Amino acid sequence: MKKGIIGKKIGMTQIFTEDGTRVPVTVIQAGPCVVTQKKTASIDGYSAVQVGFDSTPAANASKPMLGHCTKSGQGVFRYLREFKFDAASEMNLGDVLTVEQFTAGDFVDVTGTSIGKGFQGVIKRYNFRGGRASHGSRFHRAPGSIGASATPSRVFKNKKMPGQLGNTQVTMQCLQVIRVDADDNLLLIKGAIPGHRNNIVLIKNSVKA
């Protein structure tokens, strides 16, 4: 059965297993999330559920968002995301998704927005080797030639060049759930996940596990 929930990255810490092994983990505040919309194959072309996370005052929401969220009867939410569940047809508006759907030992995929680094050169962006640092060298951190002048007289698509680094959607696959704290809605996942603290992430069961 497919699982999914919206969460917020709290930070990283470390825990110790019974045999004394130190395990680095990322702490995620996962849910609770509320089903705000059901999508069906007959109407929308696919089956999915839209869930809301992080309640916000109604005064902060636009009128379209206010009207959309009030259908669930659970208030207004700051973040809305979709999940394609096998049991989407069995869910109803207002149903609550909690962290209890996961158990320790599960493998999940975590999708988030990576930390933005701004405009960077090819050495930082693509790990280019760079030029010599010795006396007389005129080539240090430049990318070098990007194409010939006669043929093909253009720069090929996807040429590695300076540009924006980070601030893109990244998915980390097959991360193991170490601990589930249902009382505080916390997930402890082994290793690092994309983004800075308070970054919104999507947690789904792994497609490769």
Curated annotation (Swiss-Prot):
GO cellular component: cytosolic large ribosomal subunit
Complexes and interactors: Part of the 50S ribosomal subunit. Forms a cluster with proteins L14 and L19.
InterPro entries to which the protein is assigned, alphabetical: Ribosomal_uL3, Ribosomal_uL3_bac/org-type, Ribosomal_uL3_CS, Transl_B-barrel_sf
SUPFAM superfamilies cross-referenced by the UniProt entry: Translation proteins (SSF50447)
One GO process term, biological-process aspect: translation
Species per Swiss-Prot/TrEMBL record: Pelobacter propionicus (strain DSM 2379 / NBRC 103807 / OttBd1)
Name of a matching Pfam family: Ribosomal_L3
Function: One of the primary rRNA binding proteins, it binds directly near the 3'-end of the 23S rRNA, where it nucleates assembly of the 50S subunit.
Protein's UniProt name: Large ribosomal subunit protein uL3
Superkingdom as given in the UniProt entry: Bacteria
Keywords: Ribonucleoprotein, Ribosomal protein, RNA-binding, rRNA-binding
Gene3D superfamilies in UniProt: 3.30.160.810, Translation factors
Molecular function as annotated in GO: rRNA binding; structural constituent of ribosome
